[in-house]
Amino acid sequence: MGEVVNQRENVVVALKHSSPSRLPRGELFFTGKFLDIYFPDFQGNYVEQIASAAYLLSLSVVGVDLNEEWSRSLLREGNYGRLREYFTVGYINGPIMQAITQLGFCQTMICIKRDQQTLSNIVAGILKDVKEKCRLAKKNDLSAIVLADDIAGSHGLFFSPGDFTDIILPYYAQIAEIIKANDLYAFFHSDGDTRVIIESLIGAGYDCIHPVDTQAGLDLYELKKTFGNRVSFMGHIDIINWDDGQIAQKVKDAEDAFKEGGLILGSTCGFSMKTISDRLHALYPQWKGVKQRQ
């Protein structure tokens, strides 16, 4: 019989760079359509679908959506406690994503430059919401909160590094402080080239950076060399652009290089009907069994 590993504790050991028993794997994002197609037995039961995905794919880390009102209801009712055996991460959209939803992309960029009071008003509402969600997340035995704020593209930030430091970073620091006050780990997500802000994110209190966007030029091993054990990373595997052989080799390389921890291995894109393919089995060997359920 194989070694029984406590999923949550092993992830914590990895985040502390303290030699986990094995490198944890996980995914933060699962679309509803993906869950309904591959886990139809629990259609309409989001928590059970996530639990099934975690069990069948041997995930240690799973993400759950805390943005929608239906999810707030699940939080209030304590339903996410069903996932307590996993290192469960609730994701909350950050101030820039929420501003873009309310104002549009161009107007949000203008606000960052010229109308910071409007942005401040949006953030005030976000902070109140984050406090409530973090309190409930802890009661549901979640392990972490990820601030999801896509603020970069393939060529860098959508605004200047100076604007990030002066305007955006203080908000991120406040959110990290709220997360930590509830004894939760603080994760940060943004696609694109975020290299210029990682040092600032560490200083603001973030424990783990997702997703290590290889298509934007991020190199996991350069990041490891630069930041050492001061932060961890999650993701790294490009299941869209790499072939089976590349994925298998990248997995092996990461397992060899991160034996002391500092990495949660997973895809860079999450699971949707647009991102999954047969190549997924190179990252998650159990995928073939899940696919047969379709």
Region roles according to the model:
Residues 2-47, 62-66, 70-294:
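Active-site loop segments of alpha/beta catalytic cores
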Residues 53, 57, 66:
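Active-site donor-binding segments of glycosyltransferases and PAPS-dependent sulfotransferases
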